[in-house]
């Protein structure tokens, strides 16, 4: 049996959101193939980035609730837990 993760309870929703993003990326590919207007393509890319940001924030929330406050896997020392979490936040913000 797979270990329980912070997103386990919302896994179906997470998979739906990821499938939607996947469809959006395919749509942008078609737009480029069809030589669509640059601003329209960039608008769709911005929407994809926003959707991914929302997914990532949900994962961070689940991680904080499950792995930091609960009994999830990861570092056992609070300082290491915070360092790990802040590293993930930093990677999100540095793109």
Which ranges hold each PLM region?
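Solvent-exposed interaction patches of small proteins and small membrane subunits
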Residues: 1-95
């Amino acid at each position: 049996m797979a270990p329980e993760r912070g997103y386990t309870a919302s896994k179906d929703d997470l998979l739906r959101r990821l499938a939607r993003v996947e469809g959006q990326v395919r749509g942008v590919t078609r737009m480029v193939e069809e030589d669509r207007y640059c601003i329209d393509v960039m608008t769709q890319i911005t929407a994809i980035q926003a959707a991914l940001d929302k997914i990532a924030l949900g994962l961070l929330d689940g991680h904080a609730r499950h792995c930091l406050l609960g009994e999830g896997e990861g570092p056992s020392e609070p300082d290491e837990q915070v360092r790990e979490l802040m590293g993930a936040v930093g990677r999100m913000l540095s793109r």
